[in-house]
Every structure is written in C-alpha cells, then in structure tokens.
A protein has these predicted regions:
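Macromolecular interaction modules
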Residues: 1-194
Length: 194
C-alpha cells in the first residue's frame, strides 16, 4: 500500500532478526523507512484516502501506540557495497542532557562519524539526523537521530564489537549521547521500492 502513495521514491522495511528475541524484548520489532521526493510531497498526503488506507492496514499488525515517527536528513558516512542478507544494525539516539541539537549533530557528523567509519568490517554507515523543525515550539522528539550500520552478517557485526575501534566509538558516546545503553536492533533489510 505504501508503494501507491504519491511522491514515494524509496521504501525499505527492516525486520528485527529472530535471534534478537533470545536476549529479551527488543526496543522495536522493526523499522520502516520512506523517502519522498521532498517534504512538500510528504505533507501533501495528509488527509488523503491513500494514507488512510495505509494507516488502516498498519493497525492490523502494528501497535500504533508504540510506533514512532521522525523526519530526518541522511548523512552517508561510509558507502561500500553490502551483500544480500547483510546484517543491518539500527541504533536510536538521544543527545546528552543540556546539549544543544546543533552541537549534538555537529559532534555526531564530525567526530563520531569518522570513528565509526574506521570500525573493521563495516560496509555502510548512515546517520539520520532528526530535522530541526521537529524541535519547533518546544517539542522534544523521541529520538535525536538514528544510526544505521551494515555488516556482511551478524557474525561480522559481533566480531566488530570486540575491536578497539568499536571501543573508541562506544567511549565517544559519552561526549554527546544520553547516558545509558544505546537502544539498538539488528535487522534484515527488505527493499520494497527503490
């Protein structure tokens, strides 16, 4: 149904891998990413029968009370090819208390991004920064951004987590991210459109 929405350029579903449930309930069962031609095309869907049909369909299999929505700008940090069936890690982040959004995004792009790009085995890395308009009128979005990383498979991702480079990335989190564990899921990507 999403494929019938006007202005959709790309649509990807990423389903949390089954083995993730062995460690407890993941933060999300998956994510849906939708890219539009532009923001106006996305806003033009409000009130349309097509969007209402998508929302009615979602209600059949998604607990909409747990669903989040953020509008982001993507920054591609590393863009090597990924094999079919690659492990796609998705981390949901918030800035540390008292940190301005601009400072958070700058640190993430300019300091944390290069650290992440150096992790062995990393194929692709995209930072999705929540758009500044999400903070208008004192609003506080659920997430300040989403980090998306791809590895050949789950074993490669888990091996990367044992490296000094990963440790440097983890240590840097304290410089700009909310204290505590990162909300993270390991998924399989399914490209529907694009």
């Amino acid at each position: 149904m999403v494929t019938k929405l006007a202005g959709v350029r790309r649509y990807v579903q990423s389903h949390t891998r089954q083995d993730a449930y062995q460690r407890g309930e993941p933060v999300y069962d998956g994510i849906a990413e939708v890219w539009f031609q532009n923001t106006a095309a996305m806003h033009a869907l409000r009130g349309t029968a097509e969007l209402a049909a998508v929302q009615a369909d979602e209600a059949r299999f998604i607990d909409r009370s747990t669903m989040g929505l953020i509008i982001t700008d993507d920054y591609v940090v590393k863009d090597d090819p990924t094999p079919p069936g690659a492990a796609k890690g998705v981390g949901f982040g918030r800035r540390k208390p008292g940190m301005m959004v601009e400072a958070f995004q700058r640190h993430w792009r300019e300091v944390h991004g290069p650290l992440g790009a150096a992790v062995p085995g990393l194929r692709r890395y995209v930072q999705s920064h929540t758009r500044p308009s999400a903070y208008n009128r004192g609003r506080d979005p659920a997430w300040d951004g989403v980090a998306i990383i791809w590895f050949d498979d789950s074993a490669a991702l888990h091996a990367a987590m044992t490296t000094p480079e990963w440790e440097r990335v983890s240590a840097d989190n304290a410089n700009f991210s909310e204290p505590g564990p990162v909300s993270f899921i390991i998924t399989s990507e399914h490209v529907i459109v694009g």
